[in-house]
């Protein structure tokens, strides 16, 4: 846990694809800006150009290019190694510090009895660090007598340009729910309705009035339903906007903790550029 005064950030959950942070004391707008930046501004690698030299399969050229673009590529090293998307705008694919070559060439003998499924693992990529995260992803079926030859190029891009570059399949911000309760108004019907929330039932059975902070409770729709029906007047659900849960689920292109780190870095750079723009305009003193 990292603490600064009344503010703290705690890693509640972390694995290869998911990170959940408990954030206290920071403004909602600031944390939400990080959440949005995760989806729209953190760069990853994805195929952007595809040249189809030969394709006699049943899959249209446009569909081949589309499927290649959706292949999730490992971008953990690429984000530090290759030039940023805006620096590569208008550049030719031959620019090695902007693009990675991705090629596919396959043919099945006409005399063969069965065809072959081409997967993401069959792609030849010029940079071994930019490899398919899910190599078993099926791309094309090549039947006997068919062939395909594609040369493609991947580059860094951002989710706001196309979702194939978004590093996260999920980026959610949740408030911490607080339950205000009055045991004197809670009948048997109310307790039965709340049976899925043993912590709440225990508080109501203890007697008296009070509040209960439900940290870690992600879904409160059932709780709100009970509050509005069987427990009307006995319980009320509120939310603490200063105690937040930020959950990010990676597509696999980047480690989840790196996604959050890069989102904060991107946000800092935006603020810096904005401050420089304001300074360049100048502010007249009154």
From Swiss-Prot:
SMART domains: RPOLD. Its EC number is 2.7.7.6. GO terms for molecular function: DNA binding; DNA-directed RNA polymerase activity; protein dimerization activity. It catalyses: RNA(n) + a ribonucleoside 5'-triphosphate = RNA(n+1) + diphosphate. The keyword Cytoplasm applies. The keyword Transferase applies. Transmembrane segments: none annotated. GO terms for biological process: DNA-templated transcription. Keywords: Cytoplasm, DNA-directed RNA polymerase, Nucleotidyltransferase, Transcription, Transferase. It is found in: Cytoplasm. It is an enzyme of class 2 (transferase). Part of the RNA polymerase complex. Belongs to the archaeal Rpo3/eukaryotic RPB3 RNA polymerase subunit family. This is DNA-directed RNA polymerase subunit Rpo3. The lineage of its organism: Archaea, Thermoproteota, Thermoprotei, Desulfurococcales, Desulfurococcaceae. The gene is rpo3.
